[in-house]
Regions:
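Conserved, mostly hydrophobic/aromatic
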Residues: 23, 55, 84, 114, ...
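Active-site beta->alpha loop and helix N-cap motifs at the rims of alpha/beta catalytic domains
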Residues: 10-132, 142
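Short secondary-structure boundary segments
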Residues: 35, 96-97, 157, 180-181, ...
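Structured C-terminal cap/extension of enzyme domains
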Residues: 182-285
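Surface-exposed amphipathic alpha-helices with a cationic face
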Residues: 52-60, 82-85, 115, 144-145, ...
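Single conserved hydrophobic/aromatic residue that forms the stacking wall/gate
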Residues: 1-8, 12
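Ligand/cofactor pocket segment of small-molecule handling proteins
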Residues: 89-91, 98-103, 107-188, 193
Length: 285
């Protein structure tokens, strides 16, 4: 999310359309708005709604828009999801509840209530390193079996064995997305259909080319693109996301603004390393 300052109620849209156009021109197949990289946790409800509406407006139906509408409060997630659907979102990305550490029964209840509240297709998002909550494969399978609009899973455990199990348990009814930029090709090898990416913010063409190559059967090229990107991916996660990627975009002249507290600016040493890696990767002069 682009911000003029770190103060509340200071989200701006001047560069959002440019950023969206850059992604689409680079081959990105869908726009995900108000997710982790979009600093959704520090947006007010009004800002959250506004940035989703703006993304839908600027995308102009060229690609689908997936709105991040997760919350650790089921009622809030339902409200955000219904508002995003009304605004024209094509799908929803809903992270597991964070901090309150729901049980698997609680997760089934949470996602079931949200699924019942909207007709939008929903991608569940499992990132236990951030949430303190792990959406287990058996739980995913139960949700997919009982709710027809729970269609996808963004898997960010970094655990290939866990990522494989929902695919085995859902008989082709689940679209798996990598939530780890360093593991896209490995996850596609077990059936993932793509990635919801931080890396693509700075190199959409490379990410698209990697996925396209894999799906066309050119595994050698896909593997090459994945391995070439590993130093950049490491740099983009050298501090908590989205600190490095906002720094990277600002270095590239995108003027996406500062971070909102409690996130803070990248350390000088890590910023220097990031710039060096970006130059080596060919995305910074």
């Amino acid at each position: 999310t682009l911000m003029r300052s770190s103060a509340a109620s200071d989200v701006y849209k001047r560069q959002l359309e440019e950023l969206i156009n850059q992604q689409i021109d680079g081959g990105t197949d869908a726009i995900v708005i108000a997710g982790t990289t979009g600093e959704s946790a520090t947006l007010t409800m009004e800002e959250h709604r506004d940035v989703i509406k703006a993304a839908i407006e600027f995308t102009k139906h060229r690609v689908p828009v997936v709105a991040g509408t997760g919350s650790n409060c089921t009622r809030t997630a339902i409200q955000l999801s219904q508002e995003a659907e009304e605004a024209g979102a094509d799908g929803l990305l809903i992270v597991t509840p964070y901090y309150n550490k729901a049980t698997q029964a609680g997760l089934i209840s949470h996602y079931s209530q949200i699924a019942d509240s909207t007709k939008c297709p929903i991608i569940m998002y499992n990132v236990p390193g951030r949430t303190g909550c792990n959406l287990l494969p058996e739980t995913v399978a139960e949700l997919v079996r009982t709710k027809s609009n729970l269609v996808g899973l963004k898997e960010a455990t970094g655990n290939l064995a866990q990522a494989s199990k929902p695919m085995a348990l859902t008989d082709g009814k689940l679209d798996l997305y990598s939530g780890e930029d360093g593991l896209v090709v490995p996850l596609m090898s077990i059936g993932a259909v793509g990635v919801i990416s931080v890396w693509s913010n700075v190199a959409p063409g490379k990410v698209h080319a990697m996925c396209e190559s894999f799906f066309k059967g050119d595994i050698k090229t896909a593997r090459k693109l994945q391995l070439e990107a590993l130093p950049l991916v490491d740099a983009l996660f050298s501090e908590v996301n989205p600190i490095p990627v906002k720094k990277a975009l600002n270095l590239m002249g995108m003027e996406v603004g500062p971070l909102r507290s409690p996130l803070c600016e990248m350390s000088e040493a890590n910023a220097k390393k990031l710039a060096e890696v970006m130059k080596n990767y060919g995305i910074l002069a």
